[in-house]
Amino acid sequence: MESIIEKAEILLEALPFIRNFRGKTFVIKYGGNAMDKADLRDAFAQDIIMLKYIGINPVIVHGGGPQIGQYLKKMGLESKFVGGLRVTDKETMDIVEMVLGGLVNKSIVQLINSYSGGHVKAVGITGKDGCLIKAKKLDAEEYFRSIGDYRPTELLDLGHVGEVEEVNPELLIHLDEDNYIPVIAPIGFDAEGNAYNINADFVAAAIAGALKAEKVLFLTDIEGLKDENGNTLSSATVSQINQMIKDGVIKGGMIPKVKACIQALEKGVNKAHILDGRLPHCILLEIFTKKGVGTEITL
């Protein structure tokens, strides 16, 4: 009987959060271990369906770097990286589009739909669809400088690696009105029709800003942001994060991720969250419990 009461208390704990977030939009960046393990993939899909059923509008932006690497290897092509960014020539870009926009995207869509009961449906798109993501070639020198990585200029032509220039949210708004869950591959295009592979964290931030989302959530392979003593922070402000970058507490691959959080907040998103995607149902645990399971970031 005691365990039954505990379950009821857990459900009741979620009630005020459900009430507050009903009708709101959450943009979720899906990647890392959460995509690689079957049990975590299932838990993610269940979380997304749960959000939709209780009246929250989830929008998913996914990565797929490891999958791209696997297919390049199968085709006898070498993966080259500069500071964590994949050098993407025209041939590589074609494979990126095939893997991200096709194989990875549709597998996520299929999994979510398998849990939907037919009442709501996921639909897979890229930034090319509906002119969703207008992009431009990444200013690599500026990008690396922003994360404290000063590289020789001659090493900075990354090919078809892009950055978001503009988001046209009209398609996403229509999909939401028709009860669809958008699943977005981070590929954009420019005025000349060139395709670009874009960091999915920054795509999620830009889309969240364009939709004026309530939250943007990043599934990662860490517990959350850590302080100088290695303790996980349950919350942090932008000023604290900037100081942690300055002090070298936040470094390496975490810098672009927190900068994506900051971009989203500056574009009007209420809160950003860095979650441990290795934890099953991390989305529900972060959103619908008082304690949460990650780091909540605010202005």
Swiss-Prot record:
Compartments in which it is found: Cytoplasm
Residues that bind substrate: 64-65, 86, 197
InterPro entries xref list: AceGlu_kinase-like_sf, AcgluKinase_fam, ArgB, Asp/Glu/Uridylate_kinase, Glu/AcGlu_kinase, NAGK-C
Superkingdom assignment: Bacteria
UniProt keywords, alphabetically: Amino-acid biosynthesis, Arginine biosynthesis, ATP-binding, Cytoplasm, Kinase, Nucleotide-binding, Transferase
EC numbers: 2.7.2.8
GO cellular component: cytoplasm
Family recorded in the similarity comment: Belongs to the acetylglutamate kinase family. ArgB subfamily.
Its biological purpose: Catalyzes the ATP-dependent phosphorylation of N-acetyl-L-glutamate.
UniProt-recorded name of the protein: Acetylglutamate kinase
